[in-house]
Structure formats: structure tokens, C-alpha cells
Swiss-Prot record:
This is Cysteine--tRNA ligase. Monomer. Keywords: Aminoacyl-tRNA synthetase, ATP-binding, Cytoplasm, Ligase, Metal-binding, Nucleotide-binding, Protein biosynthesis, Zinc. Binds 1 zinc ion per subunit. It comes from Burkholderia cenocepacia (strain ATCC BAA-245 / DSM 16553 / LMG 16656 / NCTC 13227 / J2315 / CF5610). SUPFAM superfamilies: Anticodon-binding domain of a subclass of class I aminoacyl-tRNA synthetases (SSF47323), Nucleotidylyl transferase (SSF52374). ATP binds at residue 274.
């Protein structure tokens, strides 16, 4: 099997993956700020790094996968105040909702899922170290800031220079900062802050800035220097750039070897966002589409490419997934282990080892499905099912998927008992030699999105199309 190569944002190139410790991978991914339901952009991040950790385990690595939860933040505080509830009540509710969405999408839970509020002492310890090392200062407004000019490698991840940032970026003026680009490590508490929004420290009551949260949790749980750090493309700057400055300023060590960033979700070639009104939650999508269809829609696009969201693309994903399940129908896949020497498995592995190239891996699944359709071979069916399983797909019985209704069908289509009743009426018509009526019922069902397949022995099976 070829070596795994990962596109490293830091190097701006694909690199052969070499873990710091042989056979072990330590990976940190920036998770979700929990003040609302997860949206399609969150779904992409969740699925992408679920695929990454699944593949790392599949090729024999022992993985420690950490994905954090940001449970203290300006948006969280504002939403809790608006709702008239405590911060903990709000965040607990949306953490629960996030876990429900994850389960629906077939996301395997990370090994460790730290909440920011569980690591306040570690954050304060890192801030104090940065102050001792000359990277941090307490400003006149009580905030503790990071002095970006003190970190000579600032911009190495994003390729942005401080001079270019000062000249071209709009930076909010703040007279208390030594430099407009300095960012906050510790926010001084405000009189109007609700209960649960601040902690005691040598700098006074306050709370951590967003960037220090991930630095402290990553270093505390995985060590000062670990293998992979991931997140959405929008986090590359300033969040991940600031994480590097904080972590390396505090420890004097390289923070992370490989930086991975998944691409944006777009609607009509514009980034999905609330401000543009083209924003969809996972739950809204799952009202109309099966969760595995949504997962397949995400999986079949390379993780670094833009993902264009539309009903047309989801409908196509549903039709494509239906083709894969149809190939497995009526074939009893054997239960032997996956054969990595089989040609399709080799092509699949080569694709996944080429920076997790899921479009090519999925194309290999369709090649294999074609072979299964042609030969009805149990060993090939097993290969198809097991390779797809590495992507979190084809885990159900084919008939269960083919007969399940999408949200839209559940809302306006025929229920299973209605379909069975019409099939029984068609059988009765055929027995009475009323073939015109039997054909009419078949056509009526097809118009309703139900395809019939008459089997030897007189039985009839159905699936949604």
C-alpha cells in the first residue's frame, strides 16, 4: 500500500505523512461554538474529519482524536441573555442537539471532546507563561493581549505579513492595544455579564479569548507538539495563525506538523451564511433527505474543494446512493475480512492515501457495484460493503434503505402500508387476468415514486425512486 500523503496548509503542498511516534496519530480539530443548531458547514467539518480518523485507523494507526466544544463566547452570552436562560442551560441543550445530528450522520464520536470551560486553569497558565516570555501584556482596559510583533513567524500559516495586514485589513481601532493587530487572550469582565461568564484570575475577573482556548486544550491533551490540526478553511486566519503564535510562544516548540482545512459550503457559488439568507441547518436538510444521503453528498466531493449545496445535488446524491444499495440487493455478501489485494480495494486505498481523495474512492465503489450487478458475486459484494463502510456508507440492509421514505416522501408520499395495499390490489387484478388494471396500478405507483420488481414465484418487491 502506498504511503499516506496529506496536503499540509503550512507547506502549501502534499507531504508524506510521518507521525511523531511510530504507529500513533494525535489529531486536534476545532469544533463547534454551541449557541444554535449545527448548519451544513458544520456537517461538512464533522464528516470530513470523521473520514480522516476512520482512514487513519483503517490503515493501522492508533489515533487520539480530540475535537473541542467552545461553550463560552460572546455569541453564547448574547443568546443566553436574549433567551433569559443560563449559559450552561443554553450550551448543554445545543451540545445535545449536536450529538443527535452527529449520530444521524454516522459520525463516530471523538476520543476526547473537551469543553472550553473545563480548561480555564490551563488557559490562564498559558497566558501567564506568554506574559513571562514577553508575548503578552495587560492593557489599560484590563484585557490581556498577545503582541503579534513579538512573534517573528507570525503569518507563516496564512502567508499574510504584518505589513500587508496593517495596510489592507480592516482592524477595529482600540487605543488600549499596542498594535491594532494584537488579539485578546483574556477579556476583562463587564458589569453586565451574566452569571457563569467570568472566572477569577490574577488579571481580574474575566474569560478567555477564543484563540487561547484551542491552544491550551490541544497542548494539555496532546502535548506541546502533535501531528495533525484540522478545521474549516475560514479558521486558517486568524484563528489557527493565532494558535501557532500562542502555542509556540509559550512552549518554544513546533506546535503542529500537518495543518488540514476543509473547503467552504457554497450556495449558487456564494459562501453559505446567515447574512445572505442561504443558511440551512442539518435538521432542516434532514426533514427532506435521508441522513446517509447527506453524508454521501459531502463524501463524494474532495474535502478541500468548495461544496455546492442545492436540492439538485442532493437529489443526485440520493439517486447515486440508491444505485449502490441496489447493487447489494439480493446478493448475500460473505463475511470474510476485507481483501486489500483485490484490485478495487487497491485503487480505493491509493485514492484515500492521496490526501483522502474521496471522489476517486467513490468512483471505485461504483466500478465495484457494476461488477456486482454483472456477476452477483458474494465476495465482490463484501468488498463493496466493507470499502463503503470505511466512508461510513452502506451500513444498512439494502431493502431498508430502498424502501425508506425521505422527509419529503413522508410528508406527501405513500406510506409503506398504502404501497403494500396497492401491490395486493395489483396481484388480485393479475389473478383476475385484468392486466390493464394491473398496469394502471404499476404506473400509478411509479408516478408516486415507487418502482415495482416482480420476482420469480409471484412475489413483488418495491423501492422508492
Amino acid at each position: 500500500m502506498e504511503s499516506l500523503r496529506i496536503y499540509n496548509t503550512l507547506a502549501r503542498d502534499k507531504q508524506v505523512f510521518v507521525p511523531r511516534q511510530s504507529g500513533e496519530v494525535r489529531m486536534y480539530v476545532c469544533g463547534i461554538t454551541v449557541y444554535d443548531y449545527c448548519h451544513v458547514g458544520h456537517a461538512r467539518m464533522l464528516v470530513v474529519f470523521d473520514l480522516v480518523q476512520r482512514w487513519l485507523r483503517a490503515i493501522g494507526y492508533r489515533v487520539t482524536y480530540v475535537r473541542n466544544i467552545t461553550d463560552i463566547d460572546d455569541k453564547i452570552i448574547r443568546r443566553a441573555v436574549e433567551n433569559g436562560e443560563t449559559i450552561k442551560s443554553l450550551t448543554d441543550r445545543f451540545i445535545g442537539a449536536m450529538h443527535e445530528d452527529e449520530s444521524a450522520l454516522g459520525i463516530q464520536r471523538p476520543d476526547i471532546e473537551p469543553r472550553a470551560t473545563q480548561f480555564i486553569p490551563q488557559m490562564l497558565g498559558m497566558i501567564e507563561t506568554l506574559e513571562t516570555n514577553g508575548y503578552a501584556y495587560q492593557a489599560s482596559d484590563g484585557d490581556v493581549n498577545y503582541s503579534v510583533r513579538k512573534f517573528t513567524n507570525y503569518g507563516k500559516l496564512s502567508g499574510k505579513s504584518l505589513d500587508d495586514l496593517r495596510a489592507g485589513e480592516r482592524v477595529a481601532a482600540n487605543d488600549a492595544k499596542e498594535d491594532p493587530l494584537d488579539f485578546v487572550l483574556w477579556k476583562r469582565a463587564k458589569p453586565e455579564d451574566p452569571e457563569g461568564a467570568s472566572w477569577a484570575s490574577k488579571y481580574g475577573m474575566g474569560r478567555p479569548g477564543w484563540h487561547i482556548e484551542c491552544s491550551a486544550m490541544g497542548c494539555s491533551l496532546l502535548g506541546n507538539h502533535f501531528d495533525i490540526h484540522g478545521g474549516g478553511q475560514d479558521l486558517q486566519f486568524p484563528h489557527h495563525e493565532n494558535e501557532i503564535a500562542q502555542s509556540e510562544g509559550a512552549t518554544g516548540e513546533t506546535f503542529v506538523n500537518y495543518w488540514m482545512h476543509n473547503g467552504f459550503v457554497q450556495v449558487d457559488n456564494e459562501k453559505m451564511s446567515k447574512s445572505l439568507g442561504n443558511f440551512f441547518t442539518i435538521r432542516e436538510v434532514l426533514e427532506r433527505y435521508d441522513a446517509e444521503v447527506m453524508r454521501f453528498f459531502i463524501v463524494r466531493t474532495h474535502y478541500r474543494s468548495p461544496l455546492n449545496y442545492s436540492d439538485v445535488h442532493l437529489d443526485d446524491a440520493r439517486a447515486s446512493l440508491t444505485r449502490l444499495y441496489t447493487a447489494l440487493k439480493d446478493v448475500d455478501a460473505d463475511t470474510l475480512a476485507l481483501d486489500w489485494n483485490e484490485p478495487h480495494a487497491q485503487r480505493f486505498a491509493a485514492a484515500m492515501n492521496d490526501d483522502f481523495n474521496t471522489p476517486v474512492a467513490v468512483a471505485t465503489l461504483f466500478e465495484l457495484a457494476g461488477e456486482v450487478n454483472r456477476t452477483r458475486d458474494a465476495s465482490l459484494a463484501r468488498q463493496l460493503k466493507q470499502l463503503a463502510g470505511l466512508l461510513g456508507l452502506l451500513g444498512r440492509e439494502p431493502r431498508a434503505f430502498l424502501q425508506q421514505a425521505s422527509g419529503a416522501a413522508q410528508a406527501g408520499g405513500l406510506a409503506a402500508d398504502e404501497i403494500e395495499a396497492k401491490i395486493a390490489a395489483r396481484v388480485a387484478a393479475k389473478q383476475a387476468k385484468d392486466y390493464a388494471e394491473a398496469d394502471r396500478i404499476r404506473a400509478e405507483l411509479l408516478e408516486a415514486g415507487i418502482a415495482l420488481e416482480d420476482k420469480p414465484g409471484g412475489s413483488t418487491e418495491w423501492r422508492r425512486v
